[in-house]
């Protein structure tokens, strides 16, 4: 979870910031344009448009509003997952790990340009070189294909460098304490979930930080409790849309959440459907606000020190951009605050 930046100026050049925007066919006879949604031109810090987030990572962008005592509203980034409560196994994985991403994404069914982007995201140099070696034997490689490959590679690497916290003047924030495993969070030590999080590339770490909000957020001595339980976990398979204990949360998937990119494909769905005359009940309750039944992603524990000016655009480079979990960039929780509630703080 992160603060939504102010955005770009009206006169600023419109730039597609989605990492999948450069997808093209390596076959000169095929014309293809990546179907990005309009938010791809928003400087929101996701570096992926909502269309591709839904299609590839089974998540959809949202905002989490936070109000202060004067009713001022600050919107934080968060995502809701699009995994039904009846789904099991590999279908519940939102962001897979480096060991299983090719199977989870079914990479062999994608265009080579999209495969190349995923391999770059997961730092799989061997797979990247394999694609290049295979394309060298295609017709028109030197006259056309090589130029297209370099364009896709350069555009993707530019975004990956932007989301790498170790890059000079990186635009991603790393100056807050954030835990994705609350087991040792009260002692300001990371757990297994945090170690697994650190194995991800900078792009995927930024994506998780944007998509997953904390159960608890502590700003100095002020503690905000958003949820009393996690709605996702990070394990060896990746970021998974599963609760730590008990049955999965009810999460109905609307028809608008389904990407219908394959109209000729037969898909069988077992859905819950109500029948009968409900108009009278609808009229009685129509004046009340509806409670959303979808499941936003909450996990862990986050601590922010007000000296870091949390409420500013977090794309502005910090004094210590390389501060990571357990580092000395921020102060620990005040006595009697971090140990009172039963959860943690994270983003």
Curated annotation (Swiss-Prot):
Q: Which GO terms describe its molecular function?
A: structural molecule activity
Question: Is Protein transport included in the keywords of this UniProt record?
Answer: no
- What UniProt keywords are attached to this protein's entry? Capsid protein, Late protein, Virion
* InterPro entries xref list: Baculo_VP39
Indicate where this protein is primarily found: virion
Q: What else is known?
A: Expressed late in infection.
What is the stated purpose of this protein? Most abundant structural protein of the nucleocapsid produced during the infection cycle. The monomers are arranged in stacked rings around the nucleoprotein core.
The UniProt family comment states: Belongs to the baculoviridae major capsid protein family.
Write down what this protein is called.
Answer: Major capsid protein
Q: Which organism is it from?
A: Autographa californica nuclear polyhedrosis virus (AcMNPV)
